[in-house]
Swiss-Prot record:
Gene Ontology cellular-component terms listed: cytoplasm
Function (record text): Aspartyl-tRNA synthetase with relaxed tRNA specificity since it is able to aspartylate not only its cognate tRNA(Asp) but also tRNA(Asn). Reaction proceeds in two steps: L-aspartate is first activated by ATP to form Asp-AMP and then transferred to the acceptor end of tRNA(Asp/Asn).
ATP-binding among keywords: yes
Domain of life where this protein originates: Bacteria
Residue sites binding ATP per the record: 222-224, 231, 484, 536-539
Region of interest (Aspartate), residue spans: 200-203
Catalytic activity annotation: tRNA(Asx) + L-aspartate + ATP = L-aspartyl-tRNA(Asx) + AMP + diphosphate
Lineage: Bacteria, Bacillati, Bacillota, Bacilli, Bacillales
Keywords of this entry: Aminoacyl-tRNA synthetase, ATP-binding, Cytoplasm, Ligase, Nucleotide-binding, Protein biosynthesis
UniProt-listed GO biological process terms: aspartyl-tRNA aminoacylation
Similarity comment text for this entry: Belongs to the class-II aminoacyl-tRNA synthetase family. Type 1 subfamily.
Subcellular location: Cytoplasm
The protein's name in its UniProt record: Aspartate--tRNA(Asp/Asn) ligase
Chief location bin: cytoplasm
């Protein structure tokens, strides 16, 4: 078998007159009565091959047996196409290959999905036949971008003198965060490893070990409820450094991301990225990961609401809640009563009891609650919301968390429906100064907003014992177009501070020692100040490639129910395997 001389998508007019050896898949076959045309595809693109009896009867006879997705080896001569046959939509559209020889390297059954960017297959079928789905050019291009992103990051971190170090996959189960995936030990009866949710503790121990600058393209595992942008196993760019301030870490990440955007996407983004405190993000956007590509910020009307004539507003403020609104500029005529009812049902998903609304017309406010506002109140309301004729005003009155969640989600929905979002923009944003802890009423305890190893502001350390809810974290999230790309922080590196953190989280001394004794002891041997960040590679590629589903950026992903339709994992195992592990199943019957 002769060696391939050209990739299909790389045959250009410069090769006219040359004999080429091509190998690839049949994208399409057209029989034009005496002539057969085949579009031959490989990962670089498509080239048209012509089978002509005047060139080779033998090749034509073979071509008559060929069908879509057959794998071929074609030998032929490159010629220019006639003027009327030029296809400028293809990189190879000015030439074609006149086949002199062809051999079938492998035949193919009729595929269950169309091998094209615009396939009509359902996602389940695509996942079951993932090896066919991956043949689609859009999928290859996504993974080429993933490779380019990873390569650029590695090269950048190498120039910054970071070492790539692998940390364990079999590790210790810890109680914080999502559920662990557990792996039973055959050697240690009744004991289990856990797959890492992140390399957090190990990268900190590498700082204790004096490595100073570490990174890893790390596989992580979390047994959690899945969404469109979550997977049970995922990849993060994990970075940690000693002796750097928060500003130095953020500056380095900005330089890295601007290089990624330029090298992998061909887009120039400016640095430094804007910074916004967590409290401001929640107040203005109702989200800790705001999409800043469009306006429509939330406006706090609580002071106005406390003295207005609408009881729903006043009672919300009196009970410690708040009233906020968004002004959908020029949207009054675009939303009927039925449309607004749909928006009301939408905010109820986020805990809101309802959605109040007003339309601004030339002669004043119109809508079901307009009667509750006199002329003076209406004027104040319009001035506060900068409302003019044609605007749609939408209000939620409730607990602060409900107001933020519901209006934040409504803002994003309206941004899409009203086409306010410039999809060509890439808006990076740092969200800083997070709360250190969050209180869970159901569990009646505090949880770490990021993780238990986040350093509080120095002046807030004592608050861990007196007012934990007021303690601020030296933490930062990187947001891109409303998606959290990753999060990081400066880390606790002193034993006494870490013990105070564990105590605030409800750990007894014994529990802290049992779970994290190795870390606490490490902090007694000269641990340097350190910090870092972890960036979600899958999500970054999803955004840069213009995909809407994280599964499109992972070669062999799981479904929303954490199963693999291709291999049918998870699956039962043999009784002998369980006996070897001294395990017995106690499967609950479905009711």
């Amino acid at each position: 078998m002769a060696e391939r001389t050209h990739a299909c998508g790389k045959v250009t007019v410069e090769a006219v007159g040359q004999t080429v050896q091509l190998k690839g898949w049949v994208q399409k076959r057209r029989d034009l009565g005496g002539l057969i045309f085949i579009d031959l595809r490989d990962r670089t693109g498509i080239v048209q091959v012509v089978f002509n009896p005047e060139t080779s009867k033998e090749a034509l006879e073979v071509a008559e047996t060929i069908r879509s997705e057959y794998v071929l080896h074609v030998e032929g001569t490159v010629v220019e196409r006639g003027e009327g046959a030029i296809n400028d939509n293809m990189a190879t559209g000015r030439i074609e290959v006149q086949a002199t020889k062809v051999s079938v390297l492998n035949a193919a059954k009729t595929t269950p999905i169309i091998i094209a960017d615009d396939t009509d297959a359902s996602e389940d079928v695509r996942l079951k036949y993932r090896y066919l789905d991956l043949r689609r050019p859009v999928m290859f291009n996504t993974f080429k971008m993933r490779h380019d992103v990873t390569k650029t990051i590695r090269n950048f971190l190498d120039t910054e003198e970071f070492l790539e170090v692998e940390t364990p996959i079999l590790t210790k189960s810890t109680p914080e965060g999502a559920r662990d995936y557990l792996v039973p030990s055959r050697v240690h009866d009744g004991e289990f490893y856990a797959l890492p949710q992140s390399p957090q503790l190990f990268k900190q121990l590498l700082m204790v070990g004096g490595f100073e600058r570490y990174y890893q393209v790390a596989r992580c595992f979390r047994d959690e409820d899945l969404r469109a942008d979550r997977q049970p196993e995922f990849t993060q760019i994990d970075i940690e450094a000693s002796f750097l301030t928060q500003d130095e870490i953020l500056d380095m990440m900005e330089r890295m991301m601007t290089k990624v955007m330029k090298d992998a996407k061909g887009v120039e983004v400016s640095a430094p990225f804007p910074r916004m405190k967590y409290a401001d993000a929640m107040a203005r956007y109702g989200s800790d990961k705001p999409d800043t590509r469009f306006e429509m910020e939330l406006t706090d009307l609580s002071e106005f609401a406390a003295g207005c004539g609408f009881k729903v507003f006043t009672s919300a403020v009196e009970s410690g809640g708040q009233v906020k609104a968004i002004n959908a500029k020029g949207a009054a005529s675009k939303y009927s009563r039925k449309d607004i009812d749909a928006l009301t049902e939408f905010v109820k998903v986020y805990g809101a009891k309802g959605l109040a609304w007003l339309k601004v017309e030339e002669d004043g406010l119109k809508g079901p609650i307009a009667k509750f506002f006199g002329e003076e109140d209406a004027s104040v309301l319009m001035n506060t919301l900068e409302a003019t004729a044609g605007d749609l005003l939408l209000f939620v009155a409730d607990k602060k968390s409900v107001v933020a969640d519901s209006l934040g989600a409504l803002r994003l929905r309206l941004g899409k429906e009203l086409e306010l979002i410039d999809e060509s923009k890439f808006n990076f944003l740092w969200v800083t100064d997070w709360p250190l802890l969050e209180y869970d009423e159901d569990a009646d305890r505090y949880f770490a907003a990021h993780h238990p190893f986040t350093m509080p502001f120095r002046e807030d350390v004592e608050l861990l014992e007196t007012a934990p809810e007021k303690a601020r974290a030296q933490a930062y999230d990187l947001v891109l177009n409303g998606y959290e790309l990753g999060g990081g922080s400066l880390r606790i590196y002193e034993r006494d501070v870490q013990e105070k953190m564990f105590k605030a989280l409800g750990f007894s001394q014994e529990e802290a020692q049992e779970q994290f004794g190795f870390l606490l002891e490490a902090f007694e041997y000269g641990t340097p100040p350190h910090g870092g960040i972890a960036l979600g590679l899958d999500r970054l590629v999803m955004l840069l490639a213009g995909r809407t589903n994280l599964r499109d950026t992972i070669a062999f992903p799981k479904t929303a129910s954490a199963s693999c339709l291709l291999t049918e994992a998870p699956s039962p195992v043999a009784e002998a395997q369980l006996e070897e592990l001294n395990l017995k199943l106690n499967v609950k019957e479905e009711k």
